């Protein structure tokens, strides 16, 4: 899986800190999107920790719909906006 590959690369290359950012599309209520984006990020964080990433060095945060990478006017754009991004601070 992609996340398995990410975990392996992080362990191989090292890291000082990792921020897992969850994102949503703009549909639905703002509060629900914030919660969903955090749940999405926290799920990835938990998986990476289960694969050997140091829990104290990885944090999850929910961004909600505030930073889209595509339009929210199409199904494809909304799908692209429902994502998780990793911000890695190297050692």
Task: Give the residues covered by each predicted segment.
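Periplasmic OmpA-like peptidoglycan-binding domain that tethers envelope proteins to the cell wall
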Residues: 8-91
């Amino acid at each position: 899986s992609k996340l398995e590959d990410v975990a392996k690369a992080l362990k191989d290359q090292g890291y000082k800190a990792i921020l897992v950012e969850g994102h949503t599309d703009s549909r639905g209520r703002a509060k629900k999107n914030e919660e969903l984006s955090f749940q999405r990020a926290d799920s990835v964080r938990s998986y990476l920790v289960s694969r050997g990433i140091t829990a104290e060095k990885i944090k999850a945060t929910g961004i909600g719909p505030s930073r889209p990478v595509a339009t929210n006017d199409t199904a494809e754009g909304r799908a692209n906006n429902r994502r998780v991004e990793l911000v890695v601070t190297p050692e």
